[in-house]
Amino acid sequence: MLATDSDPIVAIATAAGRGGIGVVRVSFGRGGEAAAQALSDALCGQRLAPRHASYVPFVDAHGAPLDRGIALYFPAPHSYTGEHVLELQGHGGPIVMQLLLQRCLDAGRGFGLRLAEPGEFTRRAFLNDKLDLAQAEAVADLIEASTEAAARSAGRSLDSAFSRQIHALVEDVITLRMLVEATLDFPEEEIDFLEAADARGKLAKIREQLAHVLGDARQGALLREGLSVVLAGQPNVGKSSLLNALAGAELAIVTPIAGTTRDKVAQTIQVEGIPLHIIDTAGLRETEDEVERIGIARTWSEIERADVVLHLLDSRTGMTPEDETIAARFPDGVPVVRVLNKTDLTGVPACVEHPAAAGDLTEVHLSAKRGDGIDMLRAELLRIAGWQAGAEGVYLARERHLIALRAAQEHLAQAADHAEQRAQSLDLFAEELRLAQEQLNAITGEFTSDDLLGVIFSRFCIGK
């Protein structure tokens, strides 16, 4: 839990380091108009007109100038936090920013001004109904976006695209709950509220809409989190060459000497806006070399955590007994793509195959050295991830959102079962609808615990 939500708070709102402009932001809590005017008098030597940019000197306690810049005063509720807010925009050097910050703290000591906690400005925006919880999370996601697609999707979430979908679902669930409750409250009435309003049809439509939202949310989560891809196999099958080919840069040392890579080498690349976290690992084999053994142990740890494993083979030898032993140790539930590398030495054309004997496993024949088949491998990784090329209107989502959507989906499925039994299960029908609504409301922040809010906002940067 953050300190006190009514305290005046201050922080540097721009990134650390040097820049053309730096911003110090102050939010004054409840009823902070007098404090805002007092601080602007102390720092700027004048009271500021609301929502007007004033070019003023920023002065210390003795009236000596610290900097000159733009001061902006936003009276409540028309500000980012919904409180009275003062922003000082000066030159973006770290020393001058620290001087302005300390000057604010000294001048505001009398009314309890303190340093803001991470995410506290956005937390107040949420508490003052300027943003819902999904939008607040989108602020952090927009700042942290690692690809253009992720940034655009976070922008759509911030613009309420995700929240509007959730609110529409909640309204439909509430409407259906009203029909069920009316039937429960007036059992003696001759009117069958559920039949008259086609309750089953309404429920089916809600479930269909929820499935669509969940599909979009999965795409958004993929944009945010990306895919962890581990390159595994015996030494000298071309794992480092494949990493370099996927990344388009010489990141790993490539030699004909087996065991060159002794620890993991990681690189994040973008494919259609999806971050792929590619991890090159030590070759898997029996060895007496202690350093190499440590690297191999780390390889298996990475494989356990992977979203996808690329099992590299030498296309000249195919699947050897040693490769069979390695494949047998791959964890259940982690997709494996068998990559037969070095087709430049065999003359086999690059291709993707689905051998009948391999079940669901896919084989990609390629040459990391020449680049043949690399695009096929990228496409296969996107297919495994479930990415739909050209998907429009995707909004960024988090694992928390997916969990809530899946839980709501399960409650609605249970509600559908109870709807079929009618009289015997009407109470349970109503309860499952209530639980589904509760899960959906948790996404936008209605009925959300303080503990969860504390975790979410603590992950923001200070000053946001």
Swiss-Prot record:
Any one Gene Ontology molecular-function term assigned to this protein's record:
GTPase activity
Q: Cofactor(s) for this protein?
A: K(+)
Q: Heme: is it a keyword of this entry?
A: no
| Main location as per UniProt | cytoplasm
* Cofactor binding description: Binds 1 potassium ion per subunit.
Compartments it resides in: Cytoplasm
GO biological processes = tRNA methylation; tRNA wobble uridine modification
- GO cellular-component term (any): cytosol
Q: Which CDD domains does the UniProt entry name for this protein?
A: trmE, TrmE_N
What positions does the entry give for Mg(2+) binding?
Answer: S240, T261
Positions annotated to bind (6S)-5-formyl-5,6,7,8-tetrahydrofolate: R25, E87, K130, K464
Tell me which EC number(s) this protein carries.
Answer: 3.6.-.-
- Residues at which GTP binds: 236-241, 255-261, 280-283
Keywords tagged on the record: Cytoplasm, GTP-binding, Hydrolase, Magnesium, Metal-binding, Nucleotide-binding, Potassium, tRNA processing
Stored HAMAP family = GTPase_MnmE
Q: Explain the purpose of this protein.
A: Exhibits a very high intrinsic GTPase hydrolysis rate. Involved in the addition of a carboxymethylaminomethyl (cmnm) group at the wobble position (U34) of certain tRNAs, forming tRNA-cmnm(5)s(2)U34.
Q: What does the subunit comment say?
A: Homodimer. Heterotetramer of two MnmE and two MnmG subunits.
Q: Give the family, as the similarity comment puts it.
A: Belongs to the TRAFAC class TrmE-Era-EngA-EngB-Septin-like GTPase superfamily. TrmE GTPase family.
Its name, as the record gives it, is tRNA modification GTPase MnmE
Taxonomic source organism: Burkholderia vietnamiensis (strain G4 / LMG 22486)
Lineage from the top down? Bacteria, Pseudomonadati, Pseudomonadota, Betaproteobacteria, Burkholderiales
Q: Which gene encodes it?
A: mnmE
